[in-house]
Amino acid sequence: MSVNLTINGMQVSAPEESTILEAAEAAGVIIPTLCHHPDLTDVGACRMCVVSVEGARGLQTACTTPAVEGMVVETESTEAREARTFVLEMLLTDHPNDCMTCEADGDCELQRWVYEYDVAFPDHQGIRHDTPIGADPSPVILVDMNKCILCGLCVRACSEVQVHDIWNFSQRGFTTIVVAGANQTLQEAGCLSCGTCVAYCPVGALFDRPSQGWGRAIHQKKVRTTCNYCDVGCQFDLNVNIHTGKITRVTATPEAPVNGMALCVKGRYGNDFIHSEERLTTPLIRDESVVEGRFPGFREATWDEAVALVAESLVHWRDTCGPESVGYFSSAKCTNEENYLMQKISRAVSKTNNVDHCARLCHASTVAGLATALGSGAMTNSIADATEEAKLYFVAGSNTTEQHPVIGRKMLKMIREKGTKLIVADPRRIELCDAAVLHLQQRPGTDVALFNGIMYEILANGWEDRAYIDARTENFDVFREMVMMFPPERAAEITGVPADKIREAARLLAENKPAAVFWAMGITQHTTGTMNVMTLANLQMLLGNIGVPGGGVNPLRGQNNVQGACDVGALSNVYPGYQRVTDPTHKAKFEEAWGVEGLSDKVGLTIVEMINAAHTGDLKALYVMAENPMTSDPDLNHVREALERLDFLVVQDIFMTETAKFADVILPGACFAEKDGTFTNTERRIQRIRKAVDPPGVARPDWEILCDVATAMGYPMAYPSPAAIQDEIAAVTPIYGGVRYWRLDAGESLQWPVTDDAHPGTPILHVGTFTRGKGLFTANDHVEPQECPTVEYPFTMTTGRVLYHWHGGAQTRRSQPLMALSPEPLVELHPDDASRLGIAEGDKIRVTSRRGDFIARAWLTDRVALGLIFGTFHFPEGNVNWATGAFLDPQAKIPEYKVSA
């Protein structure tokens, strides 16, 4: 339905329930505002949008007045302009006259409208606010409340976008101010330092502190790109000073398809690593005679020399000891195009499938489990659909607000605004638990028993979707027989979750359809990870929640391009597009496409298996691109010994990482801001990254380096651009068949499968039919973790990340704002356990397993249960992976990071 009205003599049609402001904007009529943003609730606070409405008494605020049929509006009446001028004059009586030095100069809405309405600073000056500038110690948000115009945008943004409610109004009348918490510092009030308030502030009252003094808005160019931290796929603009060539700040954009104006602290403030003085700037070759300089033990080399040595060594070991003696670590930090080239070199040049990347360490069990059950190992629904259309979220093993913050905050927003229900299954009491109707705090490693117990209750009450099961699935009877072995009482005995909570979870899932299931590494990083994933697929098929809006099985992937790296074949068992290396048809297809013979049909070694092979001497040479196994792999003492035993190691990275220190050759790559390419996010959305600045020194984009190495190995690679590589990917990868740069650059937002150039993409998988035909119910039994507590090792250790750091910390430890917010490693320990051991808050403690130990400060918290400790791998000295074990899921070969004794 629509309404018809007249604005400035022009006939306008607008959707029903539009405001005058929305109707005017849709018709191209600009009405001034200072407190309006389309993302937020309108409050009519600034009075700048007042308009004349025929028949109405007085001026009306366009942002809050509904557009109605037959309304006649004049936006530029004398009365309206005079009122706006008066508002601006009053604001200037209590506003600093410091535009010449203000950080917001050129990007200030007040300045814009003062200029537009030709308003001068008044000769008279009334009482003015006088608050200390920058007194709040936040390392990321510069607060100057002398410039605040009380628009309330920061208050509403924090509440409505972040659902965090840090900013609020205090006092009344002229003394009204905006404060954090109960007039506290931002950190005291619990601020997450996301900077959303800064993004919405129309003046200079809130500003990005790290950007202070880096250049005015007029001196910046904006380059649209995609974040290189997690796989949510947030897009933003890198602001580059046109004079210095340096990135000055990150600004959100409402056009971003996934995140809009929302960003997390890492995305907004964690990119100063780009210009770190620790960046690698030139190729390096090991030379123990070098004892001084930036990198003792290495000498600088030319690109020709370094590439020649790499190529010569890789060819030597291939020809001397066979293709299986060479391995390649590709990277989820790199682009689709670069991962494609890396696996192509491994297969077409070295003739081995020994190529893998960090998906093996985080979501390999997701790929294996979903491929078995559904035929496709990826998130089924789009982020917007799963968060906005679901009636219930079942979040298992995902600390969403810390690890995928934009999705986590979106969940909290829907819970508050729409009443979406939330069930959390997690051994820790994470932030989401505060908004949940039910927290299932299972013992680590008992997920299958928990989910089977829930499904027992669903079946016992006849709550399953029989029509869906009969029409779309198979193997139900075998599955049912297994599930009926897990009544809630038995599941409770195994998991530690009370039986009544298991029953309540089943009831909530049955009564609130569609429900969306989300999980992350709390589900996947187990020796039973693949079974965990298949059991969640069972649950959603049982309820008929797959292939429908608001439902689905939705793994939240880790690294920025872990989905894409899998898609383009950086896995040991599949070519691009998940075409199996053991299938003769696929082998022949890629031999023809790549112009080679003799591609291997033997499944290659995974990351952990390659490390093991290096340890035994079977793997001679290893090429590592933007991976850091000396921080991210389990059992780091074993990894260190393996790297030391390699005959040749080449590391291609942007920093001298812990792994690079073992290398024979180091090749300096370009980071995401220094090259073009594409990333694919967790919802299968392919998005562009774009070059904003030059790499430091003679560092080069990874795709260019790989082309040179392949050519030097005797297999010429010459692509004019990443777009040309993407065209080749499209030619051999059916799910990417219609992915083209010209489509992405035209603004198309494509989710695979995209089968041809006219295909619009696929927001929801398995609609009507599953990729494999019928969904496969699997029978999954409870299996205990490989390690359980003993008298000698009485604690269970689980692992993860914190909000302010990312994985091994190579980037975040080189970000000043992030290090200021989280400067050292912490271990979560229950207060009662700490009391028994005589440990106080903040004590440095040593955590020891059968394999090794690490040191971190104790954080005493009931977020963890008795007998459970939680640590991270962001800091070398406090890295839990000195203590974790390399016990592998037999199907996906993923290590069991989540349970160590």
Where are these regions (language model features)?
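N-terminal cofactor/phosphate-binding cores enriched in small/glycine residues
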Residues: 12-69
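Short beta-alpha connecting loops at secondary-structure transitions
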Residues: 6, 69-75, 183, 434-442, ...
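Hydrophobic alpha/beta core scaffold segments
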Residues: 347, 602, 607, 611-619, ...
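N-terminal export/assembly segments and adjacent metallocofactor-ligating motifs
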Residues: 2-13, 17, 25, 53-55, ...
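Long, low-complexity segments enriched in small/aliphatic residues
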Residues: 556, 565-571, 722-817
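Flexible glycine/proline-rich, aromatic-decorated loop/lid segments
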Residues: 53-56, 428-431, 654-690
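Long, contiguous, secondary-structure-rich segments that constitute the structural scaffold
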Residues: 695-698, 702-752, 814-828, 832-901
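A glycine-rich, hydrophobic/aromatic-adjacent loop/helix-cap motif
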Residues: 510-615, 758, 768-772
